[in-house]
Amino acid sequence: MKYTIRLYLLIALLAIFSGCSKKEAFKPGEIYNGFTLVKKQFVEEINAECLLFRHDKSGAQLLKVANDDPNKLFNIAFKTAPENDWGTPHIMEHAVLNGSKNFPVKSPFDVLIQGSLNTFLNAMTGKDITTYPVASMNDKDYFNLMHVYLDAVFNPLIYSDPKILQQEGWHYELGSKDEPLTYKGVVYNEMKGVYSSPQNELEYLVYKNLFPDNAYGFESGGHPSEIPKLTQEYFISFHQKFYHPSNSYILLYGNADLNKELEFIDREYLSGYDALEEKVEIPLQKSFNTMKEAEKTYPVQEGSPVADQTFLSLNFVAGSSTDRALCMTFDVLAQALVNHESAPLRLALQEAGIGRDVRAEFQEMQQNIFQITVQNANPEDKDRFREIVFKTLQEVAETGLEKTMVEGIINRMEFNLKEGDSAQKGLMCLFMTYQPWFHADDPFAGLEFNKPLEEVKKALNTNLLESAVKEHLLSNNHALLMVLKPEHGLQAKIEQATNEELNIYKTSLSSENLDNIMVQTTRLLEHQQREDTPEALATIPMLELSDIGKEIEWYPINEKTVANVPVLHYDDFTNDIVYTNLYFDLKDLPQELIPYASLLNALLGKLGTENYTFGELAMN
């Protein structure tokens, strides 16, 4: 991680507290601006002081990751468990960004961008989470963005303006009584595009079959065939249920003044709410008595080949995301069993001639999924695929995996964890904390990766990996063999069914009802084309030139010479990783050889050397 802390300055150890008031040492059990400090701990893995609060009145949870990083991040997330395939979590993510009580413009963030120095501005929907992260290096901008985001999620205009759901979710569109009735909407059209991919259809079917009785069996993004079932009444009730501070998880990252952050959030928003007694929980899916099998088809264009176009996928529900060591173990197994070039399952399937692309993925969730998928296969390969996978897993359980390969994979995992290669360190902390925070009320577990990593390193001298294969794969009935094969004409059938559904509905409507839909179509178009009023635009906080600092951050470089080669050195917190760049002066290289220098640069690292094969380099 590239922070600006100097390792050789003892005083820099105090910088980790820069997000806190220098006049006040935060103490667990004490109350600060309506927030009780629950836990305070220095997390060496991210070189930051982390403070977990609970807002006494509203029940909101808040984690401050305090360090000297000026790239401050604010995020508010909600546990949003879908109750159907209508796409309500996804549509709500869009909808709350269409104006709010204090900022009544059609798209506050489009306006904000014109007067903001944000380094990140987005919103995302997952299987059980909707999250709203924003970052800025400017203090005033940071609080402006925080203000707009909080108002968006807690005071959206969706209650008074049904056109927001119509625009962002779905609506009937009818230009005249002679035209066909159609479905339109931002998310509706987006998800039609998403489900034009067979990979996404496969994922949808896997979750449907593995989790038939809980929220993970539903598509939080919305399935095109189901989105038009969403009503304004249900939409409002969803916001009331899930977008309450008691169900919120707020993350603050960086060097902003913590007292100021807490005071603002409490005063402007949370103090107006009372905590709910009922907590949003997703019940666990009961395990199966025997492995499931399912087969479906996906559309392909007429005339395109169907041979070698089938997906075969074995899926296992394996433990929980709250078990950090187990999650790391399966990250290693995904590589060691399948994804590595010399992985035994990859080689066995290649030798059998099943498919042309095999991939393992591990999805961290309340109940994790380990997936082995072969593309470009055929339906008749199903039984051989299953037989080869289980035979190979049995061999691995009995004889183990190649230790040098496993060591290389673990070393790479450790490097990636320590490096945290992202310009948005706050966003990285968000993704690290959310699973254990949501499902075990412990965000620290996601940040403190050294302990589970040490457990996984034991795989080099123990049967840790082999035991995981036995317990969670070979002896696991909560599993699914999914076959997804191509079908000519399926897309035409889907479109015909949708058109017939719309036509039947249209013929059932009275002339007055048709007039109402046409009026709604016109009004929505007028709304989309109407400019915001100057009064509404004036509510959006903008930076002025005087708000922008003129200081330039300076990185002092130590210059020295080693073996007649100039060396530039900079001390920084890099989590024990040394970064070295070698630069070669090409001024004497003939012009005609310049393209070959570029080719050489592309090849280096992808070829063997005098002392190591490419495979050995990859493992090390």
Locate predicted features.
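An aromatic/glycine/proline-enriched structural segment found at the starts
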Residues: E24-G29, Y249-D308, T399, L502-K506, ...
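Sec-dependent signal peptide recognition
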Residues: K2-L10
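Scaffold signal of the M16-like zinc-metallopeptidase fold and its non-catalytic homologs
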Residues: A95, G99-K101, L145-Y159, S176-S246, ...
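M16/insulysin-pitrilysin zinc metalloprotease superfamily fold
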Residues: G99, V134-E179, Y183, Q366-S422, ...
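C-terminal motif of bacterial Sec signal peptides marking the signal peptidase cleavage site
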Residues: I16-G19
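M16/MPP (pitrilysin/insulinase) zinc-metallopeptidase core fold and M16-derived inactive scaffolds
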Residues: A66-D151, P162-I164, S196-S197, G217-S220, ...
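His/Glu-based metal-binding/catalytic segments typifying zinc-dependent metallopeptidases
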Residues: A66-D68, N75, Y188-S196, N200, ...
